[in-house]
Amino acid sequence: MLQLTAVGQRYGDHRVLHDITLTVPAGQLLCVVGPSGCGKSTLLRTIAGLLPAREGTVTVDGAPVTGVPDSLAVVFQDYGRSLFPWLTVRDNVALPLRRRGLARAERRAEADRILDRVGLSGAAHRHPWQLSGGMQQRVAIARALVCRPTLLLMDEPFGSLDAQTREDLEDLLLEVHRTDGTTIVFVTHDIDESVYVGDRVVVLSPGPGSRIVRDLPVRLPGRRDQIATRGLPEFVALRAEVGRAVRSREAE
């Protein structure tokens, strides 16, 4: 379980986040949306331990976050810069396992297992610069999953991809969540995406001093489908509710 209690964050005299209190149960996929510049990425980096909370506390499974927990993985939007161009796809994915001291054969087997899962088994010997943007992001996701994290943080991971590739990766994320039960915090600027992939959507107010203004459960019937789900009355209504919350002066 992830717990944030009265978390505040600032850069010098500039307050970014104010009084963020949030509980994310184990196995939940939480989406965070809000206006540009409201501190969504700062919130994610604070959860990850990359930025110490200036106020309040962050705990994962009851333990205070004082650095990046071993049970946590992060996927950023800028997949191109997160991969090492001189390493093969397999070696990029296996890198966290090397740091954990696994033998070469074990690293290779685990990397191949996860590459097959994300649909890249035929690209193991290639290098990142030989791949499309969508394939590079699949590599980044595979590298995050290879250590079997209990908490996965994703910072607008599909924001720079074309629509078809984004939909494919949204469905991959849902499959991973459904199969592994990983707790996921997913930051996005795309309201439709938040409703489609999320179990719950949290809306942040504009900055400075962003706070949570809406906390909405996502209750959609049936298994998610890119065409059928987006046409459901429940989807349309919730999308409108999230959109109003993001744009409303109530959030200011």
Residue positions per predicted region:
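Catalytic Walker B motif of ABC-type/P-loop ATPase nucleotide-binding domains
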Residues: 152-155
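Short coil-to-helix segment of the ABC ATPase nucleotide-binding domain corresponding to the Q-loop/switch region
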Residues: 86-94
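Conserved ABC ATPase "signature" region
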Residues: 98, 105-123, 175
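Conserved signature/switch motifs of ABC ATPase nucleotide-binding domains
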Residues: 126-129, 147
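Conserved ABC transporter NBD signature motif
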Residues: 56-68, 110
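Helix-to-loop junction immediately C-terminal to a conserved catalytic motif
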Residues: 48
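The feature captures the beta-strand-to-loop junction immediately N-terminal to the Walker
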Residues: 33-35
